[in-house]
Curated annotation (Swiss-Prot):
GO CC term (a single one): membrane
Function: Delta(12)-fatty acid desaturase producing in a heterologous system linoleic acid (18:2(9Z,12Z)) and to a lower extent hexadecadienoic acid (16:2(9Z,12Z)).
Organism listed in the record: Trichosanthes kirilowii
Domain-level remarks: The histidine box domains may contain the active site and/or be involved in metal ion binding.
PANTHER family: OMEGA-6 FATTY ACID DESATURASE, CHLOROPLASTIC
Record's keyword terms, sorted: Fatty acid biosynthesis, Fatty acid metabolism, Lipid biosynthesis, Lipid metabolism, Membrane, Oxidoreductase, Transmembrane, Transmembrane helix
Motif Histidine box-1: positions: 90-94
Name by which UniProt lists this protein: Delta(12)-oleate desaturase
Motif (Histidine box-2): 126-130
Gene that encodes the chain: FAD2
Transmembrane segments: 41-61, 69-89, 102-122, 164-184, 207-227, 234-254
GO biological process: unsaturated fatty acid biosynthetic process
Length: 369
């Protein structure tokens, strides 16, 4: 149900099980259609191709000052379309694209590499995020810190100008910094990097796939280099680089807002269990972009419950599970820009309630430093 946006989600063990939730979902929602999945991918690629063609064929013909209007529009529209492609590749990593794991991995590897994402590397770390959502010790990304671990300099950014600088930096650089340096990721006992097969993120049996992911990135980087030699680096940045920055920004924005909310609990190991962690997420409303992003934005709760479910069934499944989840389900329709500003202000660190002796393993966001 839709509650007051800052009214806390229940943190006690739910009075239902995952199997009880699954029983109310229509069985066809779990069916993965290779043809239907490819139809969404091809639709995204058609829009990407259209915007690319318009940019290279017609933008050079525009009289001054229309290029200054056309190029930003291209970057926005192309960035949104490529985010849709990114989501489909993410779905491949969940084995939600088709019934064939090999096809899923080939499609996911190709299109994530095209967007400079190490497919298998992120697939494995993201799988652990799904296995440990809401856990302070084991979740993989956007893990909130207790007040005692807040960096000393954060107090200088806990104001409107500081928050703006922090948000701009996070949206533009957060994704590549996470992949390369594990920024905002789970702390490890040594350096962690998605490009390093021997990183503590990965097990020994995953090393080969990490090498394959790196090869995909190197192949794409070499292709961009060759295009840059032929067309110039400025051409590459205008056509590909800036839309990619927008894709990365949307990825961080979407993920941050799915898991950061004043009403959501996080759990220490003494209290955490998988179902409560999976329910410690929130659906958001991005308007028309919900469809452009294949509803990864407004069906995230059901995605955490059933990650192999294809996106085109997630809306129906969400409506089906709402009566069972009751107050454990949260949809926040706050406009996205307002929401990210509120969350940056309200969700600074986590602490347990002072008067909750029996719930010391449950922590909530706080803002007062």
């Amino acid at each position: 149900m839709e509650k007051g946006v800052q009214e806390r989600v229940p943190h006690a063990k739910p009075p239902f099980t995952l199997s009880q939730i699954k029983k109310v979902v229509p069985p066809h929602c779990f069916h993965r259609s290779l043809l239907r999945s490819f139809s969404y991918l091809l639709s995204d690629l058609a829009f990407v191709s259209l915007f690319f063609y318009l940019a290279i064929a017609y933008f050079p013909l525009l009289p001054h000052p229309f290029p200054y209007i056309a190029w930003p529009l291209y970057w926005i529209f192309q960035g949104c379309s490529l985010t849709g492609v990114w989501v489909i590749a993410h779905e491949c990593g969940h084995h939600a694209f088709s019934d064939y794991q090999l096809i899923d991995d080939i499609v996911g590897l190709f299109f994530h590499s095209a967007l400079l994402v190490p497919y298998f590397s992120w697939k494995y770390s993201h799988r652990r995020h799904h296995s440990n959502t809401g856990s302070l010790e084991r979740d993989e990304v956007f893990v909130p810190k207790p007040k005692s671990q807040i960096p000393w300099y954060l107090k200088y950014f806990n104001n409107p100008p500081g928050r703006l600088i922090s948000l701009i930096g996070t949206l533009t650089l957060g994704w590549p910094l996470y992949l390369a340096f594990n920024m905002s990721g789970r702390p490890y006992d040594r350096f962690a990097c998605h490009y390093d097969p021997y990183s503590p993120i990965f097990t020994k049996r995953e090393w080969i796939q990490v090498y394959i992911s790196d090869a995909g990135i190197l192949g794409m980087a070499f292709m961009l280099y060759r295009i840059g030699v032929e067309k110039g680096s400025f051409w590459v940045m205008r056509i590909y680089g800036i839309p990619l920055v927008i894709v990365n920004g949307f990825l961080v924005l979407i993920t941050y807002l799915q898991h950061t909310h004043p009403a959501l609990p996080h759990y220490e190991s003494s209290e955490w269990d998988w179902l409560r962690g999976a329910l410690a997420t929130v659906d958001r409303d991005y308007g028309v972009l919900n469809r452009v992003f294949h509803n990864i934005t407004d069906t995230h709760v059901v995605h955490h419950l059933f990650s192999t479910m294809p996106h085109y069934h997630a809306k129906e499944a969400t409506e089906a599970v709402k009566p069972v989840l009751g107050e454990y389900y949260r949809l926040d329709r706050t406009p996205v820009l307002k929401a990210i500003w509120r969350e940056a202000k309200e969700c600074v660190y986590v602490e347990p309630d002072e008067d909750a002796d029996s719930d010391k393993g449950v922590v909530w966001y706080r803002k007062k430093l």
